[in-house]
Regions:
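Amphipathic alpha-helical packing segments from all-alpha helical-bundle domains
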Residues: 102, 111-137, 144-148
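Helical hydrophobic small-molecule/effector-binding pocket
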Residues: 57-61, 80-105, 112, 155
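Solvent-exposed, amphipathic alpha-helical segments
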Residues: 13-20, 66, 70, 74, ...
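Amphipathic C-terminal alpha-helical segment
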Residues: 92, 100, 105, 131, ...
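N-terminal intrinsically disordered/low-complexity leader segments
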Residues: 1-5
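Helix-turn-helix
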Residues: 9, 13, 17-50, 54
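Amphipathic alpha-helical linker/stalk segments
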Residues: 53-85, 131
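Amphipathic alpha-helical interaction segments
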Residues: 9, 50, 85, 102, ...
Length: 169
């Protein structure tokens, strides 16, 4: 198998594995699951941290669409239409078994991955969303916690679906 194909195969397996067992899962068990040696994993990812970084990039960062900040700031459209479009696209991107479970495990295990993701999301999406909300209604009416409540209520639908495995809209 070509090295890039093998790397993709290991990364896909790691995403599935970490979604099932959490980021504390070990590379020995991962290698057994994939039917490869640990040394092959470390050939493509020199450390477990490097593997987790690749998982973070694939599962979290690669799903943030570059047009979302402009969409949120496009005042030629009503704010409600912008928010509906953003959250339709965003939930389509993140409402997956892997995203939700890795995100939850990362938080429970105290990993830095979701703190970094949330910091990035706040800078790129949520802070501009707050600015637009205040521009649409009245300056300083909404605060950061209002945006987090909005965002959190939508994310909670995914948590119910993929973590609690309960019916959702």
């Amino acid at each position: 198998m070509a090295p890039e194909d093998r790397r993709r195969q290991i990364l896909a397996g790691a995403v599935s594995y970490f979604a099932e067992v959490g980021l504390s899962g070990n590379t020995r068990d991962l290698s057994q699951r994939l039917g490869v040696t640990q040394s092959l994993i470390f050939k493509h990812f020199p450390t477990k941290t490097a593997l987790q970084e690749a998982v973070y990039e694939q599962v979290f960062l690669s799903r943030i669409e570059p047009h979302w900040p402009a969409l949120i700031r496009d005042r030629s459209r009503p704010l409600l239409a912008r928010l509906e479009q953003f959250y339709t696209e965003y939930t389509r991107a993140i409402f997956t078994y892997e995203w939700m479970r890795i995100f939850m495990f990362s938080g429970l295990e105290g990993a830095e991955l979701n703190r970094r993701y949330l910091g990035h999301l706040q800078q790129v999406i949520l802070s501009p969303m707050l600015e637009e909300l205040n521009a649409a209604i009245a300056p300083e009416v909404a605060g950061p916690e209002d945006i987090w409540r909005l965002h959190g209520s939508i994310i909670y639908i995914g948590i119910r679906r993929f973590v609690y495995q309960t019916p959702t809209p």
